[in-house]
Design a protein with these regions (language model features):
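Glycine/small-residue-rich loop that forms an oxyanion/phosphate-binding "nest" at active or ligand-binding sites
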Residues: 91-98
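Glycine-rich phosphate-binding "P-loop"
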Residues: 20-29, 75-90
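Gly/Ser/Thr-rich loops at beta-strand to alpha-helix junctions
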Residues: 113-117
Length: 236
């Protein structure tokens, strides 16, 4: 049976059929260059699978994502600078406003580093977001993962697998099918897909070429890695 995929905003916490038996593919673009993002988009477009894209910056590739069937745009705000004092923007409100200015259709949010708090959750709701994706419950926890409605009626959507967490070791490879009686949301990053990252050390060793596509592509790992699992998911 073909893999049934859908977008994050389609999840209704009180309607189990909106997520049970489905597979939710998410992508955090993390300031990657256009060629890296396009590489991942081309793979998804060819497969016909649905995906939700958490965007970090304005780029013409966003319009390409919009034009690709079954793709959803979401936001990936970075609040880290507010925590360490290095932010150009002074408040969480300005961080959100900047992103929503170029992707006003966004309904889902996952913060960079999964930064969250009760105040941020309320801000997400206030600006019109409906789905928060800032919780990782890894496969190793062996829990029955489900979405839920928060106190402010924001739908909380945890994910069970993330490529950069897998790269640090200790977690199984990405599930290729929906997990029985479990919300199955997975998270990939285009830079790891492009590099076919097999380990965090390989990724770190290539940092100096992340802005130069020809060289980056030449450093793609030959053998099992993130791209391997990504392509296997898309072939499902």
């Amino acid at each position: 049976m073909a893999l049934i995929t859908d977008t994050i905003s389609s999840i209704d916490a009180v309607i189990e059929s909106s997520w049970s038996g489905k597979y939710f593919l998410t992508v955090d673009i993390d300031w990657a260059i256009d060629e890296v993002i396009s590489d991942t988009l081309d793979l998804i477009a060819t497969s016909g699978k649905a995906a939700t894209w958490f965007v970090t910056h304005p780029t013409s590739i966003i319009d390409s994502i919009r034009k690709t069937p079954r793709q959803e745009i979401a936001i990936h705000p970075n609040f880290n600078g507010l925590l360490d004092g290095s932010a150009e923007e002074s408040t969480a409100d300005t961080v959100l406003a900047r992103l929503l200015n170029f992707v006003p259709e966004a309904r889902a949010v996952r913060s960079h580093s999964m930064t969250q708090s009760s105040r941020l959750l309320q801000k997400f709701k206030t600006v019109g977001l409906s789905h928060d994706c800032n919780t990782l419950i890894p496969l190793s926890a062996k829990m029955r993962v489900r979405p839920w409605k928060d106190w402010n009626h924001l739908t909380r959507v945890p994910h069970v697998w993330e490529d950069d967490i897998w790269l640090h070791g200790g977690e199984p490879v990405v599930p290729l099918r929906p997990i029985d009686d479990c919300l199955t949301v997975v998270d990939f990053h285009p830079i790891h897909v492009a590099l076919n990252s097999p380990s965090i050390d390989h990724y770190e060793s290539t940092r100096t070429v992340h802005r130069h596509w020809p060289t980056l592509r030449s450093r793609r790992h030959v053998g099992p890695g993130v791209r391997t699992w990504f392509e296997e998911v898309l072939q499902g």
